[in-house]
């Protein structure tokens, strides 16, 4: 094979992926789709530029226009999230968490996070960014019935451990965390309160779910490509939570600590997404939550065991389903079958699963944010639930269901809640 043929093959696979994705029902809770305007920014000449440091205080020349875009971004993000500071330089949510752990913690300091099985993100773990900083990781007590942090036990834990940092948020996140209840206790013992909003940033922007910075969080970290429908990247939003020296340590941890150049084409895409969310975010977030609830209810009616019935199933973009009663391999069996039918989601540990079941966990994690952005509403959620029933409960051939999924998805090819297409119109 010639090198040109390698080039052609790569471009072919990209084209095939884009075609395939546009004909599937993507329910991965950590993904989304960007608007044409954002795509233009990400594919721009900003990808060739390097910038280090703050706008107007760069270590490289030639940043005149980059600086203007980043300053607009700081203005829009602080307005959107009512924060005192917005740092667009982290290149991912994990990178943002890494900066916070390195900026505010020292090796041996205690941090309380959500356990992986309970929905905590890997960057919070001893084997992730927290552990890399040398932090002593403790996990929140968890209440299986409410699918949330146990407030009474957590309050006791904070007082006993006197941690340096407490972290709310995670990757399995159907219900708001008790920030309002526990932040005052954390501050009594001198802890910094961090909220990992990676999954729910777009919901927070639209006034749904919860408002961490008003409920007591000092710092909010996030990725920018889940319910916040931007390019892959990160952001740190925070209040004037400490003295200038402490805030300077956080900023120093970002650059030169864990970020050099901050991928300026993605930064520009984040800025346009912030403008889209200021214009359309309220409507988008509201419809995401409506769709998640509608999908959860429809799945329950179809015979699935949906988690959180007593709490209304979900208050976020996520729907959690226990499929262990359908097959011993649970999500490890269900997710590949659904992929054959053109329904893309991921297997997921549930709080009662041991870590050893990571490849055959009980659950499926479902997110509706991308299908909401292409214009789907509550009625479409019922159809999706029925497709899933046909594959997993009725044991219909996934290839047969795939044909129906293909034609169903053909009707939803525009990216709404954007300046390109505006709001979807319900017929």
UniProtKB/Swiss-Prot annotation:
Its cofactor is pyridoxal 5'-phosphate. The keyword Lyase does not apply. Transmembrane segments: none annotated. It is found in: Cytoplasm. GO terms for molecular function: glycine hydroxymethyltransferase activity; pyridoxal phosphate binding. Its main location: cytoplasm. It holds the Pfam family SHMT. NCBIfam families: PRK00011.1 (NF000586). Homodimer. GO terms for biological process: glycine biosynthetic process from serine; tetrahydrofolate interconversion. Catalyzes the reversible interconversion of serine and glycine with a modified folate serving as the one-carbon carrier. Also exhibits a pteridine-independent aldolase activity toward beta-hydroxyamino acids, producing glycine and aldehydes, via a retro-aldol mechanism. Belongs to the SHMT family. It comes from the Archaea. (6S)-5,6,7,8-tetrahydrofolate binds at residues 120-122. The record marks 225 as: Plays an important role in substrate specificity. Pathway: Amino-acid biosynthesis; glycine biosynthesis; glycine from L-serine: step 1/1. Its EC number is 2.1.2.-. Gene3D superfamilies: Aspartate Aminotransferase, domain 1, Type I PLP-dependent aspartate aminotransferase-like (Major domain). Keywords: Amino-acid biosynthesis, Cytoplasm, One-carbon metabolism, Pyridoxal phosphate, Transferase. The modification N6-(pyridoxal phosphate)lysine is found at residue 226. GO terms for cellular component: cytoplasm. It is an enzyme of class 2 (transferase). This is Serine hydroxymethyltransferase. InterPro entries: PyrdxlP-dep_Trfase, PyrdxlP-dep_Trfase_major, PyrdxlP-dep_Trfase_small, Ser_HO-MeTrfase, Ser_HO-MeTrfase-like, Ser_HO-MeTrfase_PLP_BS, SHMT-like_dom. The gene is glyA.
